[in-house]
């Protein structure tokens, strides 16, 4: 039980951490493309 909870697969961490990162990058590029990011 401790082995499964203590050792999380890297693809699970990458997926959970990757989704918000991709979302933030998408919002950043969309904002810079539409002109909102140029003022930052």
From Swiss-Prot:
Keyword match Transcription regulation: no
InterPro entries: PSII_PsbJ (IPR002682), PSII_PsbJ_sf (IPR037267)
Gene Ontology CC, one term: photosystem II reaction center
Recorded topology in the membrane: Single-pass membrane protein
Keyword Chloroplast: yes
Keywords noted in UniProt: Chloroplast, Membrane, Photosynthesis, Photosystem II, Plastid, Reaction center, Thylakoid, Transmembrane, Transmembrane helix
Domain of life: Eukaryota
Gene3D superfamilies per record: 6.10.250.2070
SUPFAM superfamilies: Photosystem II reaction center protein J, PsbJ
Gene Ontology terms: biological process: photosynthesis
Chain segments annotated as transmembrane: 8-28
Subcellular localization: Plastid, Chloroplast thylakoid membrane
Family the UniProt entry places it in: Belongs to the PsbJ family.
Subunit structure: PSII is composed of 1 copy each of membrane proteins PsbA, PsbB, PsbC, PsbD, PsbE, PsbF, PsbH, PsbI, PsbJ, PsbK, PsbL, PsbM, PsbT, PsbX, PsbY, PsbZ, Psb30/Ycf12, at least 3 peripheral proteins of the oxygen-evolving complex and a large number of cofactors. It forms dimeric complexes.
Function: One of the components of the core complex of photosystem II (PSII). PSII is a light-driven water:plastoquinone oxidoreductase that uses light energy to abstract electrons from H(2)O, generating O(2) and a proton gradient subsequently used for ATP formation. It consists of a core antenna complex that captures photons, and an electron transfer chain that converts photonic excitation into a charge separation.
Protein name: Photosystem II reaction center protein J
